[in-house]
């Protein structure tokens, strides 16, 4: 592996992942720190509850694009490397960590679900569609974004395996899935208590 190249790609992926679209939307539209409202997250769900559908859609698309960019960057610069898939794995992990712990916001960001969607699309689009279907079914049944995200994250490594994706991508699904579930630990507590809000509720996600 070309370590200087890999480290540069991973650093760029972290910085891209850490771009705080939700925070900037809050500052631009209402001059608020969105982390002080709702769930305290900078992600699209909290933006939806705090700022409305239009800003939430824009933040969602931007966060998905961050994931796509990280994979594109890794594949473009390291595509010819024998270790290219492993560099993509590192870029993916760096992007989700950047979104959750952005250097620009004192390491307090979102839960990395949307950026992970972009990463899955860039790595293996059939897996992305399968995981999206899992999310969609769970959300349709419960109307709870966090529950759908947790189940989809847990299903991601299995989806990579069933689609016979390269080992580094399956490993990303495992590590990234565990990370996202861990980021939702507060939501899990509320789910167990029966207090986790559904979409449309004023309470925080």
UniProtKB/Swiss-Prot annotation:
GO process terms (BP): phospholipid biosynthetic process
Record carries keyword Transferase: yes
Catalytic activity: an acyl phosphate + sn-glycerol 3-phosphate = a 1-acyl-sn-glycero-3-phosphate + phosphate
GO cellular component: plasma membrane
PANTHER family per record: GLYCEROL-3-PHOSPHATE ACYLTRANSFERASE-RELATED (PTHR30309:SF0), INNER MEMBRANE PROTEIN YGIH (PTHR30309)
Quaternary structure and partners: Probably interacts with PlsX.
Name of the protein described by the UniProt record: Glycerol-3-phosphate acyltransferase
Recorded name of the encoding gene: plsY
């Amino acid at each position: 592996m070309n370590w200087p190249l890999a480290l540069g790609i991973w650093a760029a992926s972290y910085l891209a992942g850490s771009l705080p679209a939700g925070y900037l939307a809050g500052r631009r539209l209402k001059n608020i720190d969105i982390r002080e409202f709702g769930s305290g997250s900078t992600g699209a769900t909290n933006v939806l509850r705090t700022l409305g559908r239009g800003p939430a859609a824009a933040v969602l698309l931007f966060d998905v694009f961050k994931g796509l960019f990280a994979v594109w960057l890794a594949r473009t610069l390291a595509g010819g490397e024998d270790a290219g898939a492993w560099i993509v794995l590192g870029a993916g992990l760096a992007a989700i960590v950047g979104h959750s712990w952005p250097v620009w916001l004192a390491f307090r960001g979102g839960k990395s679900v949307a950026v992970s969607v972009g990463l899955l699309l860039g790595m293996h689009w059939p897996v992305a569609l399968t995981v999206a279907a899992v999310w969609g079914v769970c959300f349709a049944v419960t109307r709870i974004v966090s529950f759908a995200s947790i189940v989809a994250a847990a299903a991601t490594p299995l989806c990579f395996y069933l689609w016979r994706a390269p080992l580094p991508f399956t490993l990303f699904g495992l590590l990234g899935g565990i990370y996202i579930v861990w980021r939702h630990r507060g939501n899990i507590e509320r789910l167990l208590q029966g207090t986790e809000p559904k979409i449309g509720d004023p309470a925080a996600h």
